[in-house]
Amino acid sequence: MAPLSRVIIDTDPGIDDILALLLALSSRSDEIEVQLISLTFGNIDVRSCLRNVVSMFHIIEQELKWRRENGKPEGFDALKAFKPTVAVGADRPLDDELMMADYFHGRDGLGDIHYSHPHLTPKQAWESLFSLTGNGTAEAEVESALDGHHSSFVASKKPAYQEILRVLKENEPDTITIIAVGPLTNLALAAAEDPETFLRAKEVVVMGGTVNLPGNVTPVAEFNTYADASAAARVYALTSPRPQSTLPPLNPSAPKPLPAYPPTLSKQLTLKLFPLDITHPHDITRGQFRAKTAPIAAAGSPLAEWLSIILSHSFATLDALHPGHDGDKAALSLHDPLCVWYALTRESPLWTLSAGSPEDIRVDTTGQWTKGMSVVDRRNRKRRDDDAVSASDHGHWLSNLAGNRVQRMEGSPGTEVFGGWLLDRIFGV
């Protein structure tokens, strides 16, 4: 039976990214098939992102062994049915300075677990699988040092954007969903390299932006969009009947500006946007997490131990940063896992779009205070029936053919149920 969703997950693992990956990989094989995990800078540098993903697979292998030895259902059917490729991608934005969210996620992206609990991190030999160290380590030596702990994934030595295009070429059009939960740099590079192949995607599900809520990195910008605003603008532009109308201006200081898209393309990109407006209310509290995982960790679950260490850092950071986030009520928003939940349950009628979808949502790439802002036209202005250029329509906001066509997700199967459901799925209970 074909899975409901075949996906590429483009990610910058961080804490909620890891939860998103665990949710996907622990699901049923008839629900999802993770063909590629493409890594980008974001929450931390891309090398740390790679270490975090390899560590996750290392812990999953230990968890499966523990479950077998204790007579428990193994779970992780999606992972056992299809071994995903892992590819390293962009290490910096297209044309801006690198920024990270290590203030929240820790120096290593996972609450500093690699420093505080190094025994939970696999040996460094895994780097050679991805040609990152250049130390000439033989493949056999790498296999021996890893002791089988990369048996759940395929390591790619190609850039992530090339792997994205490969997966799209090897599958039928409109069968691959790209779930993008980090800066959109890898997607922008893939689209610039081969826009028609990129448009073979069924849809691109983006965790990014904020429309009616404040930002989380500036007063108006969400982190993923802010971290590479030009990349986000370029990907959003593919939803437009005329992508040139919303492409960001060229940055003359950029090392290698990406080319404009061809004047005509075969189709418009389907982009489902999950902004902070919908992701922020979906959370998990410290009390909820402890109640679910403490007995499992006490019984010896490697995964419960690992996640308990990581999330304890998150909840402590929330205590320090946000008034009201303390004790068992401290709540971690499940931004990235929500996008995976959609891929798993996309047929539910409870997933609803905004009344105005598709919306002309554009990304500001140059503003001193508004870079990364998701800009919408809140004026009560009538759109023009013709598509002629109008001197009074600055930015072509009122033209029928200009502007983006973004489908903004507004409703889900339930903010109250997701956190518990996520933990039940990951721990197989």
For the regions a protein language model found, what residue spans apply to each?
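Short, surface-exposed, charged loop/turn segments at secondary-structure junctions
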Residues: 101-104, 193-197, 218-225, 286-301
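Conformational coupling and interaction surfaces
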Residues: 3-4, 21-33, 226, 230, ...
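A residue-level signal for conserved active-site and pocket-lining positions in enzyme catalytic cores
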Residues: 86, 235, 340
